[in-house]
Amino acid sequence: MNSVFYNPFGRGAYAQPPIAWRPRRRAAPAPRPSGLTTQIQQLTRAVRALVLDNATRRQRPAPRTRPRKPKTQKPKPKKQNQKPPQQQKKGKNQPQQPKKPKPGKRQRTALKFEADRTFVGKNEDGKIMGYAVAMEGKVIKPLHVKGTIDHPALAKLKFTKSSSYDMEFAKLPTEMKSDAFGYTTEHPEVFYNWHHGAVQFSGGRFTIPTGVGGPGDSGRPILDNSGKVVAIVLGGANEVPGTALSVVTWNKKGAAIKTTHEDTVEWSRAITAMCILQNVTFPCDRPPTCYNRNPDLTLTMLETNVNHPSYDVLLDAALRCPTRRHVRSTPTDDFTLTAPYLGLCHRCKTMEPCYSPIKIEKVWDDADDGVLRIQVSAQLGYNRAGTAASARLRFMGGGVPPEIQEGAIADFKVFTSKPCLHLSHKGYFVIVKCPPGDSITTSLKVHGSDQTCTIPMRVGYKFVGREKYTLPPMHGTQIPCLTYERTREKSAGYVTMHRPGQQSITMLMEESGGEVYVQPTSGRNVTYECKCGDFKTGTVTARTKIDGCTERKQCIAISADHVKWVFNSPDLIRHTDHTAQGKLHIPFPLQQAQCTVPLAHLPGVKHAYRSMSLTLHAEHPTLLTTRHLGENPQPTAEWIVGSVTRNFSITIQGFEYTWGNQKPVRVYAQESAPGNPHGWPHEIVRHYYHLYPFYTVTVLSGMGLAICAGLVISILCCCKARRDCLTPYQLAPNATVPFLVTLCCCFQRTSADEFTDTMGYLWQHSQTMFWIQLVIPLAAVITLVRCCSCCLPFLLVASPPNKADAYEHTITVPNAPLNSYKALVERPGYAPLNLEVMVMNTQIIPSVKREYITCRYHTVVPSPQIKCCGTVECPKGEKADYTCKVFTGVYPFLWGGAQCFCDSENSQLSDKYVELSTDCATDHAEAVRVHTASVKSQLRITYGNSTAQVDVFVNGVTPARSKDMKLIAGPLSTTFSPFDNKVIIYHGKVYNYDFPEFGAGTPGAFGDVQASSTTGSDLLANTAIHLQRPEARNIHVPYTQAPSGFEFWKNNSGQPLSDTAPFGCKVNVNPLRADKCAVGSLPISVDIPDAAFTRVSEPLPSLLKCTVTSCTYSTDYGGVLVLTYESDRAGQCAVHSHSSTAVLRDPSVYVEQKGETTLKFSTRSLQADFEVSMCGTRTTCHAQCQPPTEHVMNRPQKSTPDFSSAISKTSWNWITALMGGISSIAAIAAIVLVIALVFTAQHR
């Protein structure tokens, strides 16, 4: 504070120097900053600092302030009667003893509830690893919390692992159940309690505003104010502000649900891992050295522990050098340990091979959005010193000796047919998005000239989904896809590194006056090798003369300082220590994402009888897939461009088509047909011919044959009878013919020889006998027709109606998802109870065993090992598909990088092996063997006013319960599974495929690379690697190899099972299952609780009559009936159809004492005769239904026809009349023949 201002709250003003007295001038009043104003300003600054401090991720402890010294004041004059000095009271500015903060109310509440219900989990050393919770008769703890529960009764419990989440549980001892927590499924967005204070629930996430909590808190409960467990903590992720928690909660059904953040870290206290360096162990997170202090020893430490599980922890600790003194932090990451290099590019700017600073090592194109990940020999995002600088890059210059140079990122370009879009970069890696082309070129401008490197690789437009678009649309729909993560911090795996081998540098040797000198650069160690009579070698740091050598070509000089890693490239000589290797993280991992894809124009649909026509318009190639929903799916797939029309047949079982990225559409044929089933014979024949052409032709043909056969047989019988009766009289001259024979055979007793003569004789002499003769055949026909009419009900076969037994409550439900089945439970003494069962979903879940996973492989080509003046032997390889070969006489005398003194004895060891691709964790396929399947159904059951939804295994044994109701379902009437014995799962799609067994893979086919998991060490591969002899012009490792079988299978996998499965099954994974398969029927036994029944107190209709006003079959509730009734009183009555022919829409109606009610029903029958009951009183409805006008609908039929209702009464009448007449004629002829035989037999 400025001293010129007077502070009344502080010490007094400074004493003024003595001056002569003068009259005081009257000065203008100036603003006088008072002490109160100063305090207000200080208070404002304190509040602002407090608010900013609370907004940080974690609260920092307040800085310890020094106690202010008391200000000196002027001594006061002593008084005469001075009191003895008393103890001075503590002022505001005097230091006080720090007090332990008192827990808040929420924290005290949580501590009180946790006292006897939360238990500590400790390891063998007694350290707390996490916690377990006693809840609802179980002890629950996270699976990642290792150790033993610190409680005598719980220490020896056997835990069971959860099948879904990272949890395990054990049964709580009986004596402890009364002290267990209860849990709640209600999660309003309020504050909750836990051990460290308040937890906020908002937006579906639990967060800690204060940021407290960390390792060791896993397993702690989050409680509400009543003491019930809302969630169990698994871990957390730091956010600004606060901490986001990973928790396990419960839904309404009691099922556990895990909510986690993408950067969540498990909060179990990890066991410290130990690493090794020079036979000395140390904690991996606290290494004895770091890279900034001792680079050589640090690289040795990392190479020694390269396969340690805590290698990443050690690498992170080696990059940080903790010191007591606070220094300015410099950006340091793993690529600080590396250096750029010169790689052999096969096509440079001059179209010739050259050593390029931007050689392309590898290109990944696994992303679905067309983004490429490229590895080059330069390092992007670092300056010359190796410090992270996003706008710079460093590369190895082409001078002698090569030196690291620096450039701008803007000078680095990637081309295909046109320049690519640069998205992100880190170290050796860059991700770009390129236009189509047949090659990829990297370019770097160095001192005004362009350095380029080109490799052949076809780059095209990539698409995801069912439409081949070239550019992603602005609007469309979102579907899952694979993209490269553009943040630099995440890892996609490891890239192998090693220290560079010995490279001869000519500039380090100097020849002067017939003498040879070694001239190291400042600060470097140089190793020389000379062959001047004897072999000489050594390491020097200053200019040194080589005795006995006269020419510079007799020596080579090698830099001995290797404090940087380089990529394990086949273009570089391997280091002397051929086994020491390191590894660094590959940035930009492949991850699951959501991509925007176009939506094709909806097709024009035109329906016809049992057929459909689609008019399709596609601006780009669009996939159309179809299948039938019956037993024979007949799947089709076609890529369509332009405007086309496709026609498809539709069955009653259903038809499904999927156009582009639109959702699948299912349609069902209606039994619409021309003609009239209740009209004249030609209309009836026309109608049934369109519905059932084969059966109609068969029946008509059979009837025609029967009529012809009946007529022929009748004529033959009559002729035979007449001849047998007349033959004896014709052989006897002047024999008298009996009157009855004359009458029946139309025979003239005297001289009549013709039928006309006989009838004329009867007409002239006896007209009565003439009419009797004509009436006898007609009477026989009428009699036979009446007999057939009486026997007709016994000749027809009708299916029995489905009806619920009042005591067993057993029904058989068609396994048709989302199709309701209704029954009426009639129990003596109780009112009828409506029972409705709807199959919501039926799952066919097979038991599976994963044989292996396969993906694209990555061929590792280590730097070659060159042995001058000798040979080497191939080591025993433990890698997958390891191939090694030694080539002798490969490099000439003192050639290039080899620099060998021999001419033909030089050897090169080339080896290769295969490992899983870095993106295999995201992009891989599973080979799964399928075994016996179980069936599980989700049923919605409504009885009375109660509705329950249960999941039950359809095996006829396992019961399911919902409150007081018990249900047993199954077994399914048809054994069915859409899965073969072997299936492949890839990106959520399932394919029936006969894959090779584990260990029997073939090159270029599915299964050429096999592993039990993406992180397993049991990798098997067969990729047909053949090493070739290197050429003498440069160091390299040539080879040939079969293409990836995984990529070949992806391009030729065909349609997934979800597009080809019969019965409309929808195939899903996790777990593998087939949903909504409409196959077979489902026997169900329901035990309805007694409380659902009510004593008879409903109205009792005494008169019930059913009249069908209109009926259209094969439509959704296309029939209307009217029930006319008389009842003893008004009330609510249950109505039900007791036949599967018709289904009523309403389960109950309100009745008056007298009146009528209208109900709607659905039927598939032409002639629907069904029984309807109202409050126990039954009546029969007769409906003659007309065919529908629409041909297709979007839902399946609600009823099933039987034989008797499938044929109209009019058709039966015509059939009966026709067949009855023929049968009567044949019967009369047979009777006549029998009488004639009997008559003639008596006269023989």
UniProtKB/Swiss-Prot annotation:
Extent of motif Nuclear export signal: 149-159
Cytoplasmic-side segments: 718-751, 1240-1244
Region (Interaction with spike glycoprotein E2): 160-165, 252-256
Region (Host transcription inhibition): 35-69
Active site: 144, 166, 218
Residue span of region Dimerization of the capsid protein: 188-198, 224-228
Catalytic activities: Autocatalytic release of the core protein from the N-terminus of the togavirus structural polyprotein by hydrolysis of a -Trp-|-Ser- bond
Record field: compositional bias (Basic residues): 57-81, 99-109
Region (Binding to the viral RNA): 85-118
Disulfide bonds listed in the record: 284-290, 481-595, 530-555, 532-549, 725-746, 855-920, 868-900, 869-902, 874-884, 1065-1077, 1106-1181, 1111-1185, 1133-1175
Extracellular topological domain residue ranges: 268-696, 752-764, 806-1218
One Pfam family here: Alpha_E2_glycop
Enzyme Commission no: 3.4.21.90
Chain intervals for the UniProt region annotation (Ribosome-binding): 103-117
Transmembrane segments: 697-717, 765-785, 786-805, 1219-1239
Additional free-text comment from the UniProt record: Belongs to the Old World alphaviruses that usually cause fever, maculopapular rash, arthralgia and myalgia. Structural polyprotein: Translated from a subgenomic RNA synthesized during togavirus replication.
Domain notes from UniProt: Structural polyprotein: As soon as the capsid protein has been autocleaved, an internal uncleaved signal peptide directs the remaining polyprotein to the endoplasmic reticulum.
Protein name: Structural polyprotein
Lineage per the UniProt record: Viruses, Riboviria, Orthornavirae, Kitrinoviricota, Alsuviricetes
